[in-house]
């Protein structure tokens, strides 16, 4: 496992982000998804974010990414949604016919933290902390 680091910490923070088109309008195809991914990869380094995985369905995208602890994820998501909405509508004018009042993305999003170990393993690890120390006393 390769950990990320900065001057004072070591970390590995993965997030699963799902962004949905407003009113679930079916606008994504491979070319639009590919361009949306390019926009993500262009903006992400400004927020210390690294794309790990990308996939789409007709009305939403799934993004797996890594971030630093000081990353303001909600600011990044808003910046991405704003830029991608503007650029995708400009570069793919046919999208506008499917949208409602020029709104591309739903206001809401789903953001889930992910990790390398199942939650139960982490809970047991946390519960066991200090037990060896208590046994020594």
Regions found by a protein language model. Give the residues of each.
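Basic nucleic-acid-binding interfaces
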Residues: 1-137
């Amino acid at each position: 496992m390769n950990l990320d680091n900065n001057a004072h910490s070591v970390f590995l923070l993965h997030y699963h982000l799902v962004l949905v088109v407003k009113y679930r309008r079916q606008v994504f195809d491979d070319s639009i998804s590919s361009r949306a991914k390019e926009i993500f990869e262009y903006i992400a380094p400004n927020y210390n974010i690294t794309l790990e995985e990308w996939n789409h369905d007709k009305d939403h995208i799934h993004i797996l990414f890594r971030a630093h602890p000081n990353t303001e994820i909600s600011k990044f998501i808003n910046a991405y949604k704003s830029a991608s909405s503007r650029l995708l509508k400009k570069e793919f004018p046919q999208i506008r016919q499917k949208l409602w009042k020029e709104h591309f993305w739903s206001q809401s999003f789903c953001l889930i933290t992910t990790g390398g170990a199942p939650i139960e393993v982490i809970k047991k690890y946390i519960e066991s902390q200090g037990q060896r120390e208590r046994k020594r006393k």
